[in-house]
Amino acid sequence: MKRLITFSVFILTFCGMNIQAQSECLPQKYSIIFGGGLSLPYVEGNRNDFFNKNGNRVGYDLMTEGRYYFLPNFAVGVQYDYLRMACLPDKAHLHYIRPNIIFRHLWSNGNQGTFFSLGIGYMDYQERTYTRDQRRGHLFQKGYCGISFGMGYEFHIKYNLSGMLRFDMLTADWFANPDARLFNPDPDGYDDGIDHSWFKNNITFFNLGFALQFGR
């Protein structure tokens, strides 16, 4: 996996450095993005899983994304995220790949912008936990249909290079809430402390980081 990540970063860097556009604004045709940052998990699991044993431990996120712009304010793309959390010898990691729809607002002659993205794809979660005097540990792996939301701020640096501050939320394991209701039947607005939303999920990751974008 480390070799795959290294190879992917190399390919993206090579492709990015060979984009010969000299435009003095953010990409409006196509772009290649790679970056990373912190990953803040919120995972509810069973009594033996990584997060219940070690808490919602902070990890890191590595990401790559390709975008094709139909309009300066609208694009489609493909994004891949790799997340890793560890409390040695226990460790957990996640692979998530999905197509994205991106909406963007530009200003300052196209040199700055904000974006919002929505994606649905495949999420593969794996963890290995150990108990005392156990060498092999307990391996758990499961695939999910993941839903992601992203937003961020883009700024032009020079030529075909721009920077990006971004926030992504990755979610999975959604289910219908058995306690769901449309409205509070209590006329006084009493809050019973129970979540009555229609849908709930058990897996959420909040990723905050920085990325470099090459494109034209």
Which positions does each model-derived feature cover?
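Positively charged n-region of N-terminal signal peptides that target proteins for export
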Residues: M1-L4, Q22
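Sec-dependent N-terminal signal peptides
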Residues: L4-C15
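Outer-membrane beta-barrel biogenesis signature
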Residues: I19-G35, G215-R216
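Gram-negative (and chloroplast) outer-membrane scaffold detector with strong preference
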Residues: K29, L40, E65-I147, F155-L161, ...
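Surface-exposed strand-loop-strand hairpins of Gram-negative outer-membrane beta-barrel proteins
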Residues: G37-M63
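Outer-membrane beta-barrel and related beta-rich outer-membrane complex signature
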Residues: N46, D90, R128-Y130, F175-R181
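Extracytoplasmic loops and strand-loop junctions of Gram-negative outer membrane beta-barrel proteins
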Residues: N46-D49, R132-G137, G189-D195
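Predominantly the C-terminal beta-signal and adjacent terminal strand-loop region
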Residues: G152-R216
